[in-house]
């Protein structure tokens, strides 16, 4: 029996996918720009 792969953690979620994590890299800033251009209500986790 395999374990469930999603083990929720608010801290890890924010650190990996949060706004500041996105802003920290050039690629992450591109992600935010793309989501803004598309008109996303939520830009990041």
From Swiss-Prot:
Record-level GO cellular component terms: ribonucleoprotein complex; ribosome
One GO process term, biological-process aspect: translation
The organism's place on the tree of life at top rank: Bacteria
InterPro entries, per the entry: Ribosomal_bL34, Ribosomal_bL34_CS
Any GO molecular function: structural constituent of ribosome
One Pfam family hit: Ribosomal_L34
Family annotation (Gene3D superfamilies): 1.10.287.3980
UniProt family annotation: Belongs to the bacterial ribosomal protein bL34 family.
Key words of the record: Ribonucleoprotein, Ribosomal protein
Protein name (record): Large ribosomal subunit protein bL34
PANTHER family (alphabetical): LARGE RIBOSOMAL SUBUNIT PROTEIN BL34M, MITOCHONDRIAL RIBOSOMAL PROTEIN 34 FAMILY MEMBER
Signal sequence bounds: none
């Amino acid at each position: 029996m395999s374990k469930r792969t999603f083990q929720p953690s608010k801290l890890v979620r924010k650190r990996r996918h949060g706004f500041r994590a996105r802003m920290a890299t050039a690629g992450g800033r591109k992600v935010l720009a793309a989501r803004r251009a598309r008109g996303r209500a939520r830009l990041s986790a």
